[in-house]
Structure formats: structure tokens, C-alpha cells
Amino acid sequence: MSGRGKGGKVKGKSKTRSSRAGLQFPVGRIHRLLRKGNYAQRVGAGAPVYLAAVMEYLAAEVLELAGNAARDNKKSRIIPRHLQLAIRNDEELNKLLSGVTIAQGGVLPNIQAVLLPKKTQKAAK
């Protein structure tokens, strides 16, 4: 009679912490990198989930704006130029990534007002 115990827990299919949190970014990998990076002696259980959520949100925001920039240029593939245009035209992302240089990004189109041709007024007849 003894030996089996009282019906232990049946292990179901394992769920990743990313899927539990409803995220695409890897919570387990971020946790491992936080531990190995010597940022602190200990890392809480919620910290990698929060960080993964923030990183996923920022990536989605940049990709959405870059996709819009690619569509405006009638392209189906996002290139570094589209990322540059997306980031520099958005006030908050530009402030966040002000010190970042994007390779092959180019510059924003900007012509000084002084250099534009003068508007001539024709005499009304």
C-alpha cells in the first residue's frame, strides 16, 4: 500500500516565462544575462520580465515607424535609412537615441530657409 504517496502533482507541459508573461522576447535569456553581467549580486524574479517587456515595446515602436517609412518610400523591406528616418522624426525616440549613430542611415532632408529661392510677387493686372 505504501510507496506511492497521496497522488503527487502531475507535471504538465512546461511553459516558458515569456509565454506566461505574454511576451516574445526571451525572459530566461535576459535573466541569465543579468546574472552573468555583474549588474547586482542578486536579480529578482520580476526584473527580467519587466526588462523584456520594455525592450519588446521599444522594438515594436521602432519597427512600426520604420515600416511606415518604408511604405512611404514604396519599399517592402526595412533598411537602415528607414530606421534613421523613423527615429529622427519621432521626438521621444530621437531624444532617447540622440547619441546613437545608425550605419548607412544618412541624414534628415533639411534645407535652410535662407537658401530657398525668393518668392517673387507678380503685379496683378
Swiss-Prot record:
Assigned protein family: Belongs to the histone H2A family.
Record carries keyword DNA-binding: yes
GO molecular function, one term: structural constituent of chromatin
Residue spans of biased composition, Basic residues class: 1-18
Oligomeric and partner information: The nucleosome is a histone octamer containing two molecules each of H2A, H2B, H3 and H4 assembled in one H3-H4 heterotetramer and two H2A-H2B heterodimers. The octamer wraps approximately 147 bp of DNA.
Gene3D superfamilies linked to this entry: Histone, subunit A (1.10.20.10)
SMART domains: H2A
Primary localization: nucleus
Subcellular location: Nucleus; Chromosome
GO cellular component, one term: nucleosome
A Pfam family hit: Histone_H2A_C
Protein name: Histone H2A
Region Disordered, residue ranges: 1-23
Keyword Nucleus: yes
Record-linked InterPro entries: Histone-fold (IPR009072), Histone_H2A (IPR002119), Histone_H2A/H2B/H3 (IPR007125), Histone_H2A_C (IPR032454), Histone_H2A_CS (IPR032458)
PROSITE patterns, alphabetized: HISTONE_H2A
Residues with PTM N-acetylserine: S2
Native source species: Sepia officinalis (Common cuttlefish)
N5-methylglutamine modifications at: Q104
Keywords: Acetylation, Chromosome, DNA-binding, Methylation, Nucleosome core, Nucleus
